[in-house]
Amino acid sequence: MMTESEFIRASEALFEHIEDQIDENGWDFDCRFAGNVLTIEAGDGTQIIVNRHTPNQELWIAAKSGGYHFAEQNGKWLATRDSRDFYDVLNEALSAASGEAVKIAEL
């Protein structure tokens, strides 16, 4: 398990990476980072929320498809419920919101 400061650094790097990937690829999303929350808004107003839950050292995604909690396991962020990969869930949510294929590369 990471220390709290390691978790915060890792999650901030991940949030920055997501924003950079969206900007570099020109996908139609606006990103806002405030506190522990990265809000990604599609052109039609659909939102995907990515936040960190520091006490449990989890990343959470909230999207139309549902809510997901991810814990770090061997260098990957995997869903606590079904072991789905963070990037798979995020890319599906972003693709559904934008109507085009979105693929955020792994950090």
UniProtKB/Swiss-Prot annotation:
Query: Which protein, by its recorded name, is this?
Result: Iron-sulfur cluster assembly protein CyaY
An annotated GO cellular component of this protein is:
cytoplasm
Entry similarity comment: Belongs to the frataxin family.
Cystine residue pairs:
none
| CDD domains noted in UniProt | Frataxin
Matching entries from InterPro entries are given as: CyaY, Frataxin/CyaY, Frataxin/CyaY_sf, Frataxin_CS
Question: Which gene specifies this protein's sequence?
Answer: cyaY
Family annotation (SUPFAM superfamilies): Frataxin/Nqo15-like
Coiled-coil annotation: which residues? Answer: none
**GO BP terms in the entry:** iron-sulfur cluster assembly
Q: Which domain of life is it from?
A: Bacteria
What keywords were assigned to this record? Iron, Metal-binding
Native source species:
Neisseria meningitidis serogroup A / serotype 4A (strain DSM 15465 / Z2491)
Q: Does the keyword DNA repair apply?
A: no
Q: Which terms does the record give in the GO molecular function aspect?
A: ferric iron binding
Q: Give the protein's function.
A: Involved in iron-sulfur (Fe-S) cluster assembly. May act as a regulator of Fe-S biogenesis.
